[in-house]
């Protein structure tokens, strides 16, 4: 196993749009941290939409890709999801986009981000203003541990994703 800073493990680290955008019916979704919960992106027809022109301005210099990790960094800090479909949606600044380098699988990195050690690092680095947040530079400095074997990363990542789904199912069952 190796340890390095999160920023050294990523080929891409950015947060969502900082601008204000007018609502537009039928346009691409503009989601925020509230839409990332329990490892998934949750949205419905009441969520904001922006014009295609605004969307293209936001993504003039980058694009989201399937497999990117979404991490909430403002408000509710530390929720994650892996982007399954990148078309027709973008995010406000409350969400960071993490794209692991080729030697780290997204599923494995998500498992690492969910560990109590990583979550404690997030907690200790957050700014305490009106709404708590973590700066990308501080996020990039958090140490992560990983195995260099992609096969081992895959097995670990799959195991914990299945376990997370099972826990979510049991939680839902308890609520009914």
PLM regions: where:
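Glutamine-centric residue-chemistry signal
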Residues: 3, 92, 119, 131, ...
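Non-catalytic DNA-recognition/assembly elements of restriction-modification systems
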Residues: 1-15
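A short glycine-rich beta-alpha junction/loop motif
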Residues: 73, 88-96, 127-152
């Amino acid at each position: 196993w190796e340890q390095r800073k999160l920023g050294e493990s990523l080929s891409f680290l950015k947060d969502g749009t900082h601008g204000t955008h007018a609502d537009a019916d039928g346009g691409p979704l503009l989601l925020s941290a509230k839409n990332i919960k329990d490892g998934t992106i949750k949205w419905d027809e009441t969520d904001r939409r922006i014009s295609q022109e605004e969307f293209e301005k936001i993504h003039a210099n980058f694009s989201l890709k399937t497999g990117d990790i979404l991490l909430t960094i403002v408000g509710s800090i530390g929720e994650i999801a892996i982007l399954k479909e990148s078309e027709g949606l973008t995010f406000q600044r409350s969400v960071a986009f993490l794209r692991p380098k080729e030697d780290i699988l997204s599923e494995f990195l998500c498992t690492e981000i969910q560990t109590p050690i990583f979550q404690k690092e997030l907690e200790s680095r957050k700014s305490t203003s009106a709404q708590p947040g973590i700066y990308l530079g501080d996020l990039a400095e958090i140490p992560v541990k990983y195995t260099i074997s992609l096969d081992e990363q895959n097995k670990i990542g799959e195991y914990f994703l299945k376990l997370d789904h099972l826990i979510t199912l049991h939680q839902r069952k308890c609520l009914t």
